[in-house]
Amino acid sequence: MKLKILATLGPSSLDSKTVRKMTEQGVGLFRINLSHTKLEDVKDIILKVQSWTDVPVCLDSEGAQIRNQDMINESVYFQKGASVKIHHKSIIGDENNISFSPDNIAQQFQDGDKVRVDFNSVCFFITEKKSDYLMAVVEQAGYVGSNKASDIDRDIVLDPITLKDREAFKIGLTMGVKNFSLSFTNSAEDAKKVREIIGYENNLISKIESIKGVQNLEDILPIVDQILIDRGDLSREVDIEKIPFVQRIIIYC
C-alpha cells in the first residue's frame, strides 16, 4: 500500500513556497479546514492552491461541533467561581460573557449541564436558564481563545453539516474540488446528507471522532470512501490510553 499524506493548510503554510515544498515531499491531499476558514475566503484559497500545485484540495466541514465564538482578546482568563453569562446570540466574549456556535445552540443547554471548552481547559457549570442567556459558574479556571472546540456532558441535537459547510462545498464543486470530509460523522444518515450535495462521483472522507461514530461504523462505511480517525476529539469520550485499541477496531472493521 502506498502511503498517502494529508496535510492541513493554515496561516503559516498557505503560501506558494511552502505548498510547493510540501508537494515535493509527497503530500497527496491538501486539507482546508472550514472551522477556521471564512466562507468568503474559500474560493480565493482554492484558486491559490490550484495555481501552486496539482495536488488536489479537500474541503473539511465544520460538522456537528460546538465552538465558542470570538473573544475580546487573544485569550480571556475565567476565574474559578466567577459568574458567567452564556448568551443565546453571538456576542464578543469577555471574562463574564461567552457565546457558542452554531447560533442559538445554547438554547439547548439546561441547568446542571457542564460545558467544557478547549479540551477541558475551562468548564462552566450552568446554574440558571433565562430567556436570552444562561447563568453559569466557572468550575475549572483557565484561558479561552476564540473559536475553540467545546462539548457538553450529554447528547444534544446538532446538524451534521452547517449552512456554511453546504455553501463551501457548492463553491468547491464549481471549482473542480472532488474531495470532501465530514467532521463528526456519527451515523450513515450524516454521510448521506453530504452525498446529497456532492454526489457519489466525488470522494467522501468520514471523520470518526465520537463513540457514536465508532458504534455506527459498519453502517457508515458503505456510504463513504475513506475513514479518518481524529484521535484528539475522540479522546473527549474515550480515555486516551484506550485510543490505540479503538483505532485497531476501526482499522479492522
Annotate each PLM feature:
Residues 1-253:
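Non-catalytic helical/linker scaffolds that mediate oligomerization, partner binding
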